[in-house]
Amino acid sequence: MATGHHLEMPLQVAVIGAGRMGGHHARIYASLPEAQLVGIVDTDISRAQALAQQYNCPAYGSIEALLAACPDLQAASISTPTIYHRALAETLLSRNIDTLIEKPLAPTVADAQALVALARSRQCVLQVGHSERFNPVVRALSKHRLEPRFIEVHRISPMRFRSVDIGVVLDLMIHDIDIVHHLVRSPVASIAAVGVAVIGRHEDVANARIVFADGCVANITASRLAMKTERRMRLFSPDAYVSVDYQKKAGVVIHKTANQAQLDIVRQQLAAEETPDLSNLDYTELVHVDQLEIDDQEPLKLQLQSFLHAVRTRTEPAVTGEDGAFAVDVATRITQAIAQHQRNDQPPSVLGTV
């Protein structure tokens, strides 16, 4: 990767996009000693100025104006609508500016792959803003050795009319596509999906069944038309069952007991020709329950700190461009399966397949 960043001085960073997420990026960068927020960009200059005033930095109406005023810019966050990601990122990466792009990386697989290739050719850090990777629950779960065989995820919330330029798959489900991929680390063998557009032209509710090459199956449901917010995951493996609540930041891991002899006795009894009476057996003696040790650190702050660390040390980011492109590819296959299902006008119980 390109070198030359001064190791002692704060990194000069900018935020492209002064909306809700851009505001959070600006807030965190302004609070970090390792960063110097040198500009906020938005085509709505008044919105950029309002945000910049809060954090005592200049505002710009275009990325070109930012680059002209800040020739030593080292890193930037892109938090604009997805359709602008590729053009903005190409402008930054072509100038060797390390870039963090809010999820999804790009609206299409071709755009995502082009950005990955450009970042690689320019030896730039390209990190994708899958902030759920930094959720305390996910970080706690990563400390456990798991071999997932089945994963079930529900991510539902009321319609907030944000990210309406994309459907619920690229808006919400993509978080779980990334997390599942992070846990499974196996190629996708097949995808089946169903979804429906209720408010706009993009799907607002979707369900996908992803089968991986290693045999693991993930069933993911996302909705932005629910009456409540819920973000839960259940994971089954040969040695453990996991249940986590992202929203409540809580989780439990249930392992098989270390008392293998006791397990073997129970298995022998169950395998016997005559069904044994095990009604007095205490099930809890066969398992070990671990509450996940979860902290209260802000995921987005951890994400930006990890990005700055990758920039400073010239190391691979926690969520790579390749990770982001994988998520876009799977999300695209899901939306294609949904479209195929709708074209076939099949009954709801039949899923479209890609």
Describe the residue ranges of each PLM region.
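Beta-loop-alpha module in the N-terminal Rossmann-like domain of NAD(P)-dependent dehydrogenases
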Residues: 25, 55-116
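Hydrophobic residues in well-ordered beta-strands that form the structural core
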Residues: 61, 101, 126-128, 244
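A contiguous active-site-proximal alpha/beta segment in oxidoreductase catalytic domains
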Residues: 106-163
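Mid-domain beta-loop-alpha active-site segment that forms a flexible
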Residues: 129-136, 159-190, 203-204, 324
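Contiguous beta-strand/loop segments that form the cofactor/metal-binding neighborhood of enzyme cores
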Residues: 177-260, 293-297, 301-314, 350-354
